[in-house]
Amino acid sequence: DLWQFNKMIKKEVGKLPFPFYGAYGCYCGWGGRGEKPKDGTDRCCFVHDCCYKKLTGCPKWDDRYSYSWKDITIVCGEDLPCEEICECDRAAAVCFYENLGTYNKKYMKHLKPCKKADYPC
């Protein structure tokens, strides 16, 4: 669920998810869309959106899943039918960490509208 995803991001990158990733670029935040992702961080959100689109029959934002930390690694459980949601969230949190160097404050609360055409997954 969204709360668990936020906790993963906070622990992985050490930043509060909402102010830093809640409205970043074209794809971070609710209803991402537009042209090519702005940078590596925005691409993490784009890939996360694509991952969610591939899931069927699972409520993406409110389905709780099991996960844990093994040393510094997120480990998703395997006990629920919608555990793939955890894998999408885990991959995005790791991607944010790997792309901390691409984070650009000019894309935070990005007010310039992104093109309406969907960039293909």
UniProtKB/Swiss-Prot annotation:
Keywords attached to this Swiss-Prot or TrEMBL record, sorted alphabetically, are: Calcium, Disulfide bond, Hydrolase, Lipid degradation, Lipid metabolism, Metal-binding, Myotoxin, Neurotoxin, Secreted, Toxin
Q: Which cysteines are joined by disulfide bonds?
A: 26-114, 28-45, 44-95, 50-121, 51-88, 58-82, 76-86
Q: Where in the cell is it found?
A: Secreted
* Description of how activity is regulated: Inhibited by magnesium, cadmium and manganese ions. Also inhibited by crotapotin.
Q: In which tissues is it expressed?
A: Expressed by the venom gland.
Q: Cite the pH-dependence comment.
A: Optimum pH is 8.0.
* Pfam families per UniProt: Phospholip_A2_1
Cofactor notes? Binds 1 Ca(2+) ion.
Under which EC number(s) is this enzyme classified?
3.1.1.4
| Active site, per annotation | 48, 89
Under CDD domains, the record lists: PLA2c
Residues involved in Ca(2+) binding:
27, 29, 31, 49
Q: How does activity depend on temperature?
A: Optimum temperature is 35-45 degrees Celsius.
Q: Name one GO biological process term.
A: arachidonate secretion
Picking any one GO molecular function of the record gives: calcium ion binding
Reaction(s) catalysed by this chain's protein: a 1,2-diacyl-sn-glycero-3-phosphocholine + H2O = a 1-acyl-sn-glycero-3-phosphocholine + a fatty acid + H(+)
Instruction: Please name the top-level EC class of this enzyme.
Output: hydrolase
* Function summary: Snake venom phospholipase A2 (PLA2) that shows enzymatic activity in the presence of a synthetic substrate. In vitro, blocks the neuromuscular transmission in young chick biventer cervicis preparations. In mice, induces myonecrosis and a systemic interleukin-6 response upon intramuscular injection. Also induces edema and exerts a strong pro-inflammatory effect. PLA2 catalyzes the calcium-dependent hydrolysis of the 2-acyl groups in 3-sn-phosphoglycerides.
Family to which the UniProt record says this protein belongs: Belongs to the phospholipase A2 family. Group II subfamily. D49 sub-subfamily.
Q: What is this protein called?
A: Basic phospholipase A2 BmTX-I
Organism whose genome encodes this protein: Bothrops moojeni
